[in-house]
Amino acid sequence: AATSSAAQLTMAGGLLQRYAQRAGGLYMQTHVAENRDEVRWIAELFPDSRSYLDVYDRCGLLTRRSILAHGIWLDDTDRERMAQTDSSIAFSPSSNLFLGSGLFDWAKAEAAGVGVAPASDVGGGTSLCQLRTLADGYKVLALQGQRMTAWQGLYAATRGAARALDL
C-alpha cells in the first residue's frame, strides 16, 4: 500500500474483481502489517482506513486468491475480515526473525478461520528451504507458548499452501 495511491489500489482491485471468474481468477499478493513502523506509516498515508488491511479491503483487493505476507500486527477485526473474504496469510518466520518484525500469532489466525501457509520471503528471509522455514515457524510459535506439530507443519506447507493458492 505504501508504494501506491488509493486510486492505483482501487484500479487494481477493479481488475481483480473483474477477472475473478475468468480462468480461475487472478491472484493478488502483497505485504500487510509486517512491522509496527510500517503499520504507523500506512495509517498516515491512508487516514480514512481503519487498519492496514482495511486499505486493501476498501479497494476490493481481498478475495479467496489474495495472499498477504506477514500479518504480524493484524487485530481481531482484520483476521475476521480475512476469514470472511477467504484471504490467506503467507507466514514468513525466517524473514520476521531476521528483521525483528515481531511474532506471528498462528493460533489467533487459525481460530479466526484464516488460512496460513509458510513462505520463505526471498527478499528478507535467510533461506528458500521450506523445511528451514517450518523450523523457524516452530520457534516463532514456541516463543509464544504455541505448538506446531510435524503434521501441522506438513499440512501448512502442502495442502495449506494449495488452499492459499486456491488450487
Indicate where each model-derived feature is located:
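Histidine/acidic residue-rich metal-binding segments in metalloenzymes
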Residues: 1-88, 100-116
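Short, acidic/turn-prone active-site loops that include or flank metal/cofactor-
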Residues: 34, 93-97, 121-124
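Short, charged, surface-exposed secondary-structure boundary motifs
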Residues: 98-103, 127-129
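His/Asp/Glu-enriched, well-ordered alpha-helical/loop segment
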Residues: 58-65, 107-167
